[in-house]
Amino acid sequence: MSTEASASSPGLVLPTSLPIPEGYEEALPPWTLDAEAWWILPPVPLPWQAKVLPKGALDPFEEERYRDLQATYTGGLGTIQLIRYHTSPVGPYDELLYVPGNMSYKTGPSSTISGLSVTRIYVSSTASVVNGNIPKQLARFEFTKEDDSDPLSPVIASVYPALLTSTSEFSPEPIFSTRLVPSRRIPNFPLDLARVPHFLLDPRLFQAPLTNSGQGNGLVGTEKWCTIIPSYSGEVRVMYPEPRLSEGKFGDGVGFPDVQPMSVGLWWPTAKILFTPPVILNVFGQPVAEEDKKTK
């Protein structure tokens, strides 16, 4: 990828010296997206309970890096997010991601980086895989409304991962499936995460450099830690997620974490999502000097 600043985004360059795959273009931040989204909330361990990541919580192509960083789950509120981006700089696409909660990474003999991280993520667009500092995998998404004439109809969502090294063949079995049931009693209400005090909800995501593992799906290795603050605003409604896989599971525990979430989640019928330019960090979690920044 180019290490020269983009004409449309002066001063911004991508956090890698590797070439972008042929046929794709760099889509530099900021990204402003219109979407529909569902948030499923994993259980939050109490202070005296063990802090253990569920099976399938870490991307297998990044596991060696996670081991090197001694990645540790330390608790706190996480999310499973299903998102249908109607507009984006790389076109419409779907996304499934998992944020376990707070993670701690040992970045040096006397340094750590701690905070929220996306550790599993699937998208339906190779262009989205290419443009990100997150371990994205390609997948096919199915969303089915039970009653097209009912605006509060439950939706069945299933995600089928791409076969290894393929961008056109997908597993016949889903790694995640759920029935999403909007509340009929509780009306929509406005929510802007930017207005929520950080001591209640710190939305910053801390993402490690990506392994260039030769997966064949367009993922490009990166070289810098970065942090980004995603901004959500729009109308929200309470919803109730139900498992659709065998044995009452949401995720299969291999391709996606097997968690039993809270019985109540959030549905964003219309959401405005903003991804501002990330801040590149040193091993102490501090922003690098302006002249050394590489953002994506």
What are the roles of these predicted feature ranges?
Residues 10, 18-19, 32-34, 47-48, ...:
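Interaction-surface and assembly-scaffold signal
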Residues 2-71:
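Short, extreme N-terminal leader segments that mark the start of a protein/domain
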Residues 40-42, 89, 262:
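Aromatic-acidic/polar surface patches that form glycan- and anion
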Residues 45-118, 124-133:
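Short N-terminal edge-element motif at the start of the domain
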Residues 16, 20, 72, 76, ...:
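Alpha-helical context
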